[in-house]
């Protein structure tokens, strides 16, 4: 793990000197998962954001023994969405796809802004790139300097569903073990799971199967210690699968920072989120921050921003066994809001010591069924670097299809607060598909007030008839007067209610 303050220092240095420690390769790995079709999608942000016309993408299919089957190269030189269906790319069984981007110009970030999709009957899962082969020994020095455990974003065990984990090996065979630990208010359950995986191999582990005697509907915190892998940055894909193990909703795991002492020198971190009235809105905070005791509160804001109510919802002690799980929908009703009144909400963490952990992780959950979306986010702080004198730009993906509904929410992240909370900022949104730009829209909003829209309704004239079977991917670019706005997208399968979502880049 790279320390949060080191991440901020890197951002500052890039803004001062853009050619410093330049990056010319970025990459990701995509697992082939039985029962689903693997795809990737991305907007040519290299060109749109940085005017980089010299980018190539190489996709390599890797077999079950870790050997290359074949590689294909594509020029990325148009201002549009690029989508690649990876499953079926070759006629041999595939373990993993290695996706790489190369450029003679500086790519800046070794992790590309790429969405990974796995879709099957009744579901579509999306997660941004979450593991990669490192570029050189200098990256190894920085990225793997601080080893930490991972924490699951969703421990759910009952007769109909289970948490699962997908472990991926890097470019060398991995022989070692995964150490699983489940902490509840009264017990600790542990197991050591042996691993022997070919290079670029994947292994799916269903928690219910390795802990067969756990109580039904157990609530707790799942922590996982991975074996170290050189030249590899590897998060786990973790999530919730139904009893068939083929239908799932997943995201990447969280850092467990509970043994890392890193703090901001103040006492408040927070983050605003859009409230989607069509869905259940929940947040879950885990006791995996740097050692601390935090007071957690929820601020509920009306659609117009005029009505606001804040209430404390619990104490989060890290390390510890107790998580905080709150239905914002139910809480808002207790606070006197009807669902149609709610426009946004904020999660706030207060410290009484004058310092607060740099990474306070939470799971943002939007749902309609047993498989809700799961979005991994961290709270923001006033000490984080925010460039001055420049516009903000964020971009991301929404899914469209005749059987899918998608919503997009745009909101100020929460820090730093504007001098005038009533500033009415101009928000410009440009939409793209595989043909290029298809639409532009503008809205105005102020601090804490969300812009929320249905993609299908907003772009009804531009997207036309949608496929009954195969979804498509719309990408949006949001330009704002200050780099403090963020976006969230959620997709629901109309037939099953299964959801998936992700934050913007």
Regions found by a protein language model. Give the residues of each.
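Gly/Pro-rich, tryptophan- and cysteine-flecked surface segments typical
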Residues: 1-505
């Amino acid at each position: 793990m790279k320390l949060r303050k080191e991440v901020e220092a890197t951002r500052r240095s890039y803004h001062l000197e853009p050619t410093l420690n330049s990056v010319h390769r970025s990459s990701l790995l995509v697992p082939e998962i039985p029962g689903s079709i693997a795809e990737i999608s991305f907007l040519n942000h290299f060109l749109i954001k940085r005017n980089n016309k010299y980018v190539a993408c190489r996709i390599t299919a890797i077999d079950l023994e870790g050997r290359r089957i074949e590689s294909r190269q594509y020029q990325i030189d148009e201002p549009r969405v690029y989508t690649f269906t990876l499953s079926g790319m070759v006629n041999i069984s595939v373990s993993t796809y290695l996706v790489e981007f190369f450029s003679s110009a500086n790519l800046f970030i070794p992790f590309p802004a790429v969405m990974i999709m796995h879709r099957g009957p009744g579901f579509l899962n999306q997660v941004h790139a979450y593991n990669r082969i490192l570029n050189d020994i200098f990256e190894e020095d920085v990225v793997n300097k601080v080893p930490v455990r991972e924490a699951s974003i969703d421990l759910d065990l009952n007769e109909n569903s289970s948490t699962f984990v997908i472990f991926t090996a890097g470019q060398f065979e991995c022989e070692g073990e995964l150490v699983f630990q489940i902490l509840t208010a009264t017990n600790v359950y542990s197991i050591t799971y042996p691993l022997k995986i070919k290079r670029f191999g994947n292994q799916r582990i269903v928690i219910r199967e390795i802990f067969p005697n756990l109580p039904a509907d157990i609530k707790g915190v799942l922590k996982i210690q991975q074996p170290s892998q050189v030249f590899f940055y590897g998060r786990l894909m973790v999530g919730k699968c139904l009893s068939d193990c083929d239908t799932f909703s997943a995201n990447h795991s969280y850092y467990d920072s509970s043994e890392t002492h890193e703090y901001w020198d103040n006492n408040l971190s927070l983050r605003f989120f859009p409230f989607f009235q069509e869905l259940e809105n929940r947040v879950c905070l885990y006791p995996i921050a740097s050692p601390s005791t935090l007071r957690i509160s929820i601020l509920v804001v009306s659609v117009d921003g005029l009505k606001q109510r804040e209430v404390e919802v619990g104490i989060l002690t890290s390390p510890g066994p107790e998580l905080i799980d709150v239905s914002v929908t139910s809480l808002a009703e207790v606070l006197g809001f009807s669902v149609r009144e709610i426009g946004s909400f904020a999660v706030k963490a207060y410290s009484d010591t004058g310092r607060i952990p740099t990474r306070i992780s939470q799971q943002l959950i939007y749902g309609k069924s047993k498989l809700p979306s799961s979005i991994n986010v961290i709270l923001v702080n006033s000490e984080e670097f925010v460039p001055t004198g420049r516009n903000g730009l964020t971009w991301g993906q929404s899914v469209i299809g005749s059987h899918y509904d998608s919503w997009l929410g745009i909101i100020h992240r929460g820090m730093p607060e504007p001098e005038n909370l009533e500033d009415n900022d101009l928000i410009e949104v440009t939409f793209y598909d595989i043909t290029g730009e298809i639409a532009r829209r503008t809205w105005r909003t102020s601090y804490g007030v969300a812009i929320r829209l249905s993609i299908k309704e907003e772009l009804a004239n531009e997207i036309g008839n949608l496929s009954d079977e195969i979804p498509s991917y719309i990408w949006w670019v949001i330009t704002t007067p200050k780099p403090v706005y963020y976006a969230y997208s959620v997709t629901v399968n109309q037939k099953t209610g299964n959801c998936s979502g992700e934050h913007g880049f």
